[in-house]
């Protein structure tokens, strides 16, 4: 489904309403300005139509169709295919939801394909359109507005995970009694942190390559914006590494407390077994049928 499609010339949007795919491709071929096409969960036929209209590489189209790709940037004969993971923290369920954005970046176009939950791309477009200086730079600046939005949205997710980790840490050390349910929650949090790390970490190297100009030569005016995004992604990645280490420590502490609790139970059972063993032994001996027991006459 087309969410929005616009042709930008001279730093401004030329059309109020969204363009069709063929009309957008025709505008891109004019070599005046550029086209930004946004799609949300397109069907295979729609993606194929976009691919034909803009001359996109079939392998990139295949990746966009299947989704669930690792974050990456690939060069296809002068146009670039970018994969990013979107993330959103669900406060009610205390879970992280993931989606995906694929970008096709060419000299005269930017095509954004969103699968599942996504960042506020409509907001990113409005903010971009409010900056004619950025619009004049072209598709690379439009792509930055999306990448920046996606990475900005990582921060509240990391903060939500941080709160969950603090809660489970307080639960473990405040009660000083290990619980199997707590162990399950720690494992769940570890899995979410690892999955989030897999979304963030692979994005850092391509962003740094963009800044260094080894993938594509960017306008100097936009390089500093990409550098800021790369720094932001690195900070989030460092935070996730710290969270993973902290969760490992909390897990080991909880398992140790469970072990101590089990030892206490075993010692308690052993003590009661020893107490019960004495009268049981006496009763078992004197309950036997002996013809001669001399000690019964002592005293």
Language-model segment annotations:
Residues 231-299:
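Hydrophobic alpha-helical transmembrane segments and their immediately adjacent juxtamembrane loops
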Residues 1-221, 225-242:
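Peripheral, non-transmembrane regulatory/ligand-interaction domains of membrane transport proteins
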């Amino acid at each position: 489904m087309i969410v929005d499609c616009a042709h930008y010339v001279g730093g401004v949007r030329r059309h109020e309403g969204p363009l069709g795919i063929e009309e957008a491709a025709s505008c891109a071929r004019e070599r005046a300005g550029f086209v930004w096409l946004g799609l949300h969960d397109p069907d295979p036929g729609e993606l194929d139509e976009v691919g034909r209209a803009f001359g996109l590489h079939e392998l990139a189209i295949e990746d966009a169709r299947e989704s669930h790709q690792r974050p990456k940037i690939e060069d296809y004969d002068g146009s670039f295919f970018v994969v990013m993971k979107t993330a959103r923290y669900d406060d009610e369920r205390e879970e992280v939801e993931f989606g995906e954005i694929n970008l096709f970046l060419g000299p005269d176009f930017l095509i954004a394909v969103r699968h599942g939950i996504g960042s506020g791309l409509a907001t990113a477009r409005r903010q971009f359109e409010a900056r004619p200086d950025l619009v004049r730079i072209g598709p690379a600046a439009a792509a930055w507005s999306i990448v920046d939005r996606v990475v900005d949205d990582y921060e509240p997710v990391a903060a939500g995970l941080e709160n969950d980790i603090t809660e489970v840490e307080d639960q473990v050390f405040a009660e000083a009694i290990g619980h199997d349910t707590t162990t399950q929650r720690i494992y769940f949090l570890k899995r979410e942190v690892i999955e989030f790390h897999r979304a963030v970490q692979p994005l850092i190297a391509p962003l740094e390559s963009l800044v260094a100009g080894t993938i594509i030569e960017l306008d100097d005016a936009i390089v500093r914006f990409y550098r800021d995004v790369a720094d932001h992604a690195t900070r989030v990645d460092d935070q996730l590494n710290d969270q993973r280490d902290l969760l490992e420590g909390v897990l080991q502490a909880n398992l140790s407390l469970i072990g101590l609790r089990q030892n206490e139970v075993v010692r308690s059972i052993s003590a009661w077994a020893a107490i019960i063993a004495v009268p049981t032994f006496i009763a078992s001996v004197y309950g036997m049928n002996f013809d001669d027991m001399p000690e019964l006459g002592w005293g």
